[in-house]
Amino acid sequence: MPAYRSRTSTHGRNMAGARGLWRATGMKDGDFGKPIIAVVNSFTQFVPGHVHLKDLGQLVAREIEKAGGVAKEFNTIAVDDGIAMGHDGMLYSLPSREIIADSVEYMVNAHCADAMVCISNCDKITPGMLMAAMRLNIPAVFVSGGPMEAGKVLLSTGEKKVDLIDAMIAAADDRVSDEDVKVMERSACPTCGSCSGMFTANSMNCLTEALGLALPGNGSVLATHADRERLFVEAGHLVVDLARRYYEQDDAGVLPRTIASFKAFENAMTLDISMGGSTNTVLHLLAAANEGEVPFTMADIDRLSRKVPVLCKVAPAVANIHMEDVHRAGGIMGILGELDRAGLIHTDLPTVHAPSMKDALERWDVTRTKAESVTTFYRAAPGGVPTQVAFSQSRRWDDLDTDRASGVIRDFEHAYSKDGGLAVLFGNIAEDGCIVKTAGVDASILKFTGPARIFESQDAAVEAILANGKIKAGDIVLIRYEGPRGGPGMQEMLYPTSYLKSKGLGKACALVTDGRFSGGSSGLSIGHVSPEAAEGGAIGLVEEGDTIEIDIPNRRIHLAISDEEMARRRAAMEAKGDAAWKPKDRQRVVSQALQAYAALTTSAARGAVRDVKSLRR
């Protein structure tokens, strides 16, 4: 029987000093035999997805105490990728994932917490906490802050839903007036919550449902809706139950590594492919699997991408559909239900809230259940009032969207595409693979050949795209030395993709990079090229004007030069000595913190995780 971890610091004569300090936090005599639960919050006023979390940690804490536990809250950092976008702030986004994971480990292990509730929401916070949960392997429940309501603008053609990506594209389009840009800006992000489309934050919060570590509705019920409060209340009670099952009944089935098994990672990736989730999820799932010693790799993602169809399309892949619409159609449990009927997921796996995913689907899939509590829950609608307050409205749709032929969520027979929403491409400039969000690629450019336009920083590419005439239809914009090590930090390329759209080139150009893309990116955007240029990847050998062939149906990307020419270029690069595999004439200040990150990070094909073995070299 495993002993409660907390008793290391709460029991025994020699822990009198520690108990004295615990008492100073409010603990009483009767508390020292209870499980100590870490409430891992991520409140900050910098991030709209986290601005409403301030009081939610204490909401969970009160429920933990009602259930017989002792709750202790702490905070992690949280970076807003949208605000950090387009300048050197984006260098810090991906590295913050490791800082978050480490900070959770530090706090939980230093204070011997028995279990934890992870209150996350935005891009790197959910992945960082997920990595920590897999690393620590103590009972854990995830509950996110929830998606924001979609913005709405009234145009001459009628009302249109919008988000921050629409505002960015409009701002770079000379045909859009300053006043219309202001209207878009003021309407794009009306409430607290993670950005309203299927961007990275919402993708990851959906995947925690598929992994079995979060309650149904975690990925889709709006931050503003009163129904979301129930998730926080239930998480507080549930985590105490899980802790008791593990420490008092020796039930290891409640631990993250048992729940988030290899098959669960397959489920999560299958969901991601079926809903056209952010390409960043590939990085984060690989990293979380690595922490839990789960042998889930790019090869598994490639295998799944070849058989999983697209059953749900959400902004930015399609206009006017956002997370509030996915929720109305049954949320993540609705998509998983269709994947189950198609025989594409494993349902014999445990979750934190049900004995198996099969049991969860029987209760929560709106096409199977007639339970009024469930159908009412999925009718939770946007309130339409700008606010930064959680649970501030309780509006409901009159009915559900259960049309699986032409609704937001489709069944297998009526899939948007039989080919999945994400694909892994391989070739002579991406020997370890690269990722494209096929759900956001127009069918007319699934095969694309063009000349490479070389840029060794995102800034240089943006400057060229905005300079009318420098980038032409048919070009392939290639941005290198922006990978995990080369950036460092693997910047998101949201501005280049958005500006291509604003210049009318969204369906006429491709973008290839060893950096990554925002969940808000769409178009023929190929990222995570591995190995990256800074690690000797062949992307560093491409020359201006070289022809690149992209063939998504056949999962291929190819630089049209001979093997002999590739070898000649590699030898010439290696002959440069210390200047080899480095960008030319790029002026970028790299702090010591980022230098330390670059020294330890690995390829995107491995999730850009740290390789501590390098410390022993």
Curated annotation (Swiss-Prot):
Cofactor(s) in the UniProt record: [2Fe-2S] cluster; Mg(2+)
Translocase listed as a keyword: no
Catalysed reactions listed for this entry: (2R)-2,3-dihydroxy-3-methylbutanoate = 3-methyl-2-oxobutanoate + H2O; (2R,3R)-2,3-dihydroxy-3-methylpentanoate = (S)-3-methyl-2-oxopentanoate + H2O
One term of GO molecular function: dihydroxy-acid dehydratase activity
Biological processes, Gene Ontology terms: isoleucine biosynthetic process; L-valine biosynthetic process
SUPFAM superfamilies given in the database record: IlvD/EDD N-terminal domain-like (SSF143975), LeuD/IlvD-like (SSF52016)
A Pfam family the protein falls into: ILVD_EDD_N
Residues where N6-carboxylysine is found: K124
Pathways involved: Amino-acid biosynthesis; L-isoleucine biosynthesis; L-isoleucine from 2-oxobutanoate: step 3/4; Amino-acid biosynthesis; L-valine biosynthesis; L-valine from pyruvate: step 3/4
Signal peptide: none
Coiled-coil zones: none
Entry GO CC: cytosol
Class of enzymatic activity (EC top level): lyase
Keywords: 2Fe-2S, Amino-acid biosynthesis, Branched-chain amino acid biosynthesis, Iron, Iron-sulfur, Lyase, Magnesium, Metal-binding
EC number: 4.2.1.9
Residue numbers annotated as active site: S518
InterPro entries: Dihydro-acid_dehy_C (IPR042096), DihydroxyA_deHydtase (IPR004404), DiOHA_6PGluconate_deHydtase_CS (IPR020558), ILV_EDD_C (IPR056740), ILV_EDD_N (IPR000581), IlvD/EDD_N (IPR037237)
Gene3D superfamilies, per the entry: IlvD/EDD C-terminal domain-like
Entry binding sites for Mg(2+): D81, D123, K124, E492
Binding site for [2Fe-2S] cluster: C122, C195
Cofactor note: Binds 1 [2Fe-2S] cluster per subunit. This cluster acts as a Lewis acid cofactor.
Subunit structure comment from the entry: Homodimer.
Purpose: Functions in the biosynthesis of branched-chain amino acids. Catalyzes the dehydration of (2R,3R)-2,3-dihydroxy-3-methylpentanoate (2,3-dihydroxy-3-methylvalerate) into 2-oxo-3-methylpentanoate (2-oxo-3-methylvalerate) and of (2R)-2,3-dihydroxy-3-methylbutanoate (2,3-dihydroxyisovalerate) into 2-oxo-3-methylbutanoate (2-oxoisovalerate), the penultimate precursor to L-isoleucine and L-valine, respectively.
Similarity comment: Belongs to the IlvD/Edd family.
Full protein name: Dihydroxy-acid dehydratase
The species this protein was found in: Azorhizobium caulinodans (strain ATCC 43989 / DSM 5975 / JCM 20966 / LMG 6465 / NBRC 14845 / NCIMB 13405 / ORS 571)
Name of encoding gene: ilvD
